[in-house]
């Protein structure tokens, strides 16, 4: 019985995802189906979206995929430094084991 509920939930979520285009307004479908435009066109569309957003949303700025990727690259740099520090600690453990032999 629980397995059936899980299957039904997955089915409903999949149908909702694939039928998303059917409930979007025609103007949004045309925007999505248009070919790749210039960056200026993309920026203008993002600006238009922000124009109808609330004051707080406009303060956050555009949240497109480009900005998301840039944020991820900023977050990955400190991790690399932490990993380099961890290698020194791991090397210390290895050297201690070699000295005991």
UniProtKB/Swiss-Prot annotation:
Composition bias type Basic and acidic residues, residue spans: 92-101
GO cellular component, one term: extracellular region
Post-translational modification: Sulfation enhances proteolytic processing, and blocks peptide degradation. Levels of sulfation differ between proteolytically-cleaved gastrins and between tissues.
Signal peptide interval: 1-21
Summary of the tissues where the protein is detected: Abundantly expressed in the stomach and duodenum. Low levels in brain, ovary and pancreas.
GO biological process annotation, one example: G protein-coupled receptor signaling pathway
InterPro entries per record: GAST, Gastrin/CCK, Gastrin/cholecystokinin_CS
Biased composition (Polar residues): 25-37
Pfam families in the record: Gastrin
Modified residues (Phosphoserine): 96
Residues cleaved off as propeptide: 96-101
Residues bearing PTM Phenylalanine amide: 92
Sulfotyrosine PTM positions: 87
GO molecular function, one term: hormone activity
Localization of this protein: Secreted
Keyword line: Amidation, Cleavage on pair of basic residues, Hormone, Phosphoprotein, Secreted, Signal, Sulfation
Region (Disordered): 23-101
Function: Gastrin stimulates the stomach mucosa to produce and secrete hydrochloric acid and the pancreas to secrete its digestive enzymes. It also stimulates smooth muscle contraction and increases blood circulation and water secretion in the stomach and intestine.
Family of this protein: Belongs to the gastrin/cholecystokinin family.
Protein name: Gastrin
Organism, as annotated: Mus musculus
Annotated gene: Gast
């Amino acid at each position: 019985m629980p397995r059936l509920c899980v299957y039904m939930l997955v089915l409903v979520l999949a149908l909702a995802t694939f039928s998303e285009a059917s409930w979007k307004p025609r103007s949004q479908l045309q925007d999505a189906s248009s070919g790749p435009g210039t960056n200026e066109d993309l920026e203008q569309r993002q600006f238009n979206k922000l124009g109808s957003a609330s004051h707080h949303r406009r303060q956050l700025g555009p949240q497109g995929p480009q900005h998301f990727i840039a944020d991820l690259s900023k977050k990955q740099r400190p991790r690399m430094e932490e990993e380099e520090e961890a290698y020194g600690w791991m090397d210390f453990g290895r050297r201690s084991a070699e000295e005991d032999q």
